[in-house]
Design a protein with these regions (language model features):
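Iron-associated oxidoreductase/ferritin-like identity signal
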Residues: 1-205
């Protein structure tokens, strides 16, 4: 029986406005249309997060800021986000779904020039991503797709939890050593870049 095509309820999930034109164009592996659309939208959201993190890399590589370990940390997280987006696209394809290629807007983080606002931006993005994954998992359950619910929870939501905790710890330590939001805590940023274990471990890989 075909899935009813009513309006979507209010949701925080990224809405792929162009996706409905493609629905029904491929053989689905019991993939509900609303879940397919949401997987498509969430994949784009993850790519946007990867681009934001990549923009932060370039900021901390600038000569007037030059925090190489901080830049390396953001680079590693950007690569992880890109891999996550590709994994979700692979899952979407395996289930017979289709991704609608979209133009991703330039990240609006040019004004970020210090460690604390960069970490706060990253933390906000990950918290939003976590909330979206929770809703996507629940949506999948509600539409009788327990497989998608399980995959989202285990492969995409679960790994975010320790990463959010890590960022919270980094922010606490950054404030403790004197980092500020306006680059006036330059020595604190130097200490974070040189001594923070999570950052030095990244730079040695």
């Amino acid at each position: 029986m075909a899935e009813p095509s009513g309006k979507r309820l209010k949701t925080n999930l990224p809405n792929c406005k162009t996706h409905r034109a493609f629905l029904g164009s491929r053989v689905k592996q019991n993939l509900p249309a609303v879940v397919e659309e949401s997987l498509c939208g969430v994949s784009t959201l993850i790519m946007e997060v990867a681009y934001i993190l990549d923009a932060l890399v370039r900021i901390f590589e600038q000569d007037d800021i030059a925090l190489p370990r901080v830049a390396a940390f953001f680079h590693e997280q950007s690569v992880n986000e890109q891999a996550k987006a590709e994994a979700m696209l692979d899952y979407l394809s395996d289930r017979g779904g289709q991704y609608c290629s979209k133009d991703i807007q330039r990240p609006g983080c040019e004004e970020v020039c210090a460690v604390i606002p960069a970490l706060e931006l990253m933390l906000g993005q990950w918290k939003e991503e976590m909330a979206v994954m929770v809703e996507l998992s629940q949506l999948s359950k509600e539409h009788s797709d327990p497989h998608s619910a399980s995959v989202v929870k285990s492969r995409f939501l679960g790994p975010l939890v320790p990463r959010v905790k890590l960022l919270g710890d980094l922010l606490t330590n950054a404030r403790r050593v004197g980092c500020t939001s306006d680059r006036s805590g330059g020595f604190g940023e130097y200490l974070i870049d040189q001594l923070q274990e999570e950052l030095t471990n990244v730079s040695s890989r």
